Amino acid sequence: MHFDDFDKEMRKYEESIDQYIPEDKYIVVRLDGRSFTRLTKRVCKFKVPFDEKFRDLMTDTVKSLMESGFKIVYGYTESDEISLLFHPSEDTFSRKVRKINTTLAGEASAAFSLNIGQIATFDSRVVPLPDKKRVGDYFRWRQEDSLRNALQGYCYWTLRDEGKTASQASRILNRKGVKFKKDLLAEKGIDFDSVPNWQRYGCGIYFKEIEREGFNPIKNEKVIAKRRELFVDYEIPYGVEYKDYVLEFLEYDV
């Protein structure tokens, strides 16, 4: 069999489960750290429940992803997860799911590993969304997850610091509501509603147009140059305001 025919025959199997995101759908990609509990608590021993060093590792990873060749207009990170919002005109790899997932998972794993000095991996999933409403709903959902996890984390580690075992702390918090958990923290002198915004709501990353003063040696004069730089927002809004905040990025030029 001629190689071209052989190649065509075998590629049918390789591409048999390929999926493409239709052009009328919005693309969001979520990446999650694999076995990060072990990495952050046992290997690197970051502070709990939050550590600015780990936060910065995650935001730097988002920045790397946003400069990896895709038309990503907004990035969000909380805990060990990342969500990326693509511009509607994104057509890299013809919007093939397999290529998007493998490329971004590889980029995230490489960037994070280089920065932390340890092998770390991420998985990736494409989330196709039908309209802007669901795009906003998606990011509100992840923000609510961040808020829930932050409250749980503060309570859990407060109990651990008091000498409770992991199983004891988990039992105390099992099936308990928000009021119980906030009251528990208040009794220990912690006002959960006053902890840093980024710990409760996560961080947003996006491009801003910055004006920089430069010098034109040919004309021997100062000039103002505009460039896009990535900005980390540690004070993102919450709830409906956050939904509106995210949707604005879909209107940005890329």
Predicted regions and their residues:
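Regulatory and interdomain segments flanking nucleotide-handling catalytic cores
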Residues: 1-254
